[in-house]
Amino acid sequence: MATRAMEELDGGLGSCQVDEDLSALADPCPSRPQEDSVRATSRLADSSSRSHDSQERVTEGSPTGSVDTKPKKMEKEPVSKVTSGAGKEKLKAGATPRSPARKKAQTASPTQPPPPPALSDELPWGDLTLNKCLVLASLVALLGSAFQLCREAVARDVEAPAPVPESWASSSSSPKGPASTLPKPEAWAPSVRQPEPPSKLEERVQIPRSEEAAEKDEWESEEAADGEHVPLAGRGPKEKLKKEKPRKERPGKEKPQKEERPRKEKPRKEEKPRGAREPQGALPRRWEAREGGHRPWGRDSGAPEDRKRQAWVSLRRPDEEDRPLGRQKRRAGKGRD
């Protein structure tokens, strides 16, 4: 039974069907190169060998009772597979098929970027950063400014002259001795006139002068004589002032007193009679005459009308009535007496 099944399978998968399929593939596009036809034949041979191996495995594992029915089904499957493979090859004109194993390998290994090179290897300065450079530059600037300030200070000291030693410092170091008298300034001693020669005095006497001029000359001559007896060097300023004689009082000329002129007495204004002096306000008023000289606010001082009247009357001074007309104050803006 097994041998029969193998023969049927061989008869079903004969070379006639494969040749027909190859002729059908070659007829529609005769202009293709021979390389495409060779590839197609190799693919069909591979597919037929795979299907044949699978059928052999099935027949070996199946029981004897089912040998007649299954080979017929298996004969139909490879034909349909061959036709479907030929149609796919027509659609893909010359495109090389990719195996699923290659696709999995490509997806599994993603492209990794190369690691960045080490900075210490490329940069010559190593670990230096921008902050370190800034700190170093600021330190250099500070040192430069300090050096410049020191240089200016040294230049000023050289330009300034050396201080001259004072005289009092040397005198303190010397041994104590008699205190040197300082020369007295000329302003202390009063100026003393030198005595005039006698020739000049005679000339002055010959010139006629008034009595006052003669007295002056005598006084000057006396002062000159006193100054000759006392030496100038031995006298101090205070002694000179004491020894000076007081000046003589000169009799001044008496001016004739002016005669006292009699003062002119202004004529006084004639005094007016008492009745004319009193102002018109002093006359009795009508309402006083009617009421018998009694004022209304004397009766009821609590009434509001009476208060107003009192305020109006109080503005007027009581002394105005008694004053005469001549002594009353003048009103501003009027030239009346």
Curated annotation (Swiss-Prot):
Organism: Bos taurus
Keyword Endoplasmic reticulum among UniProt keywords: yes
Biased composition (Basic and acidic residues): 49-59, 69-79, 199-213, 236-277, 285-309, 316-325
Presence of the UniProt keyword Membrane in the record: yes
Disulfide bonds: none
A Pfam entry, by short name: JSRP
Localization (cell): Sarcoplasmic reticulum membrane; Endoplasmic reticulum membrane
GO BP annotations listed: skeletal muscle contraction
PANTHER family (UniProt xref): JUNCTIONAL SARCOPLASMIC RETICULUM PROTEIN 1
Official protein name in the record: Junctional sarcoplasmic reticulum protein 1
Ranges of compositional bias, category Low complexity: 165-180
Record field: compositional bias (Acidic residues): 214-225
UniProt keywords, alphabetically: Endoplasmic reticulum, Membrane, Sarcoplasmic reticulum
Domain of life where this protein originates: Eukaryota
Region annotated Mediates interaction with CACNA1S, chain positions: 1-84
Residue ranges, compositional bias (Basic residues): 326-337
Function: Involved in skeletal muscle excitation/contraction coupling (EC), probably acting as a regulator of the voltage-sensitive calcium channel CACNA1S. EC is a physiological process whereby an electrical signal (depolarization of the plasma membrane) is converted into a chemical signal, a calcium gradient, by the opening of ryanodine receptor calcium release channels. May regulate CACNA1S membrane targeting and activity.
GO cellular component: sarcoplasmic reticulum; sarcoplasmic reticulum membrane
Region of interest (Disordered), residue spans: 23-125, 159-337
Subunit structure comment from the entry: Interacts with CACNA1S, CACNB1 and calsequestrin.
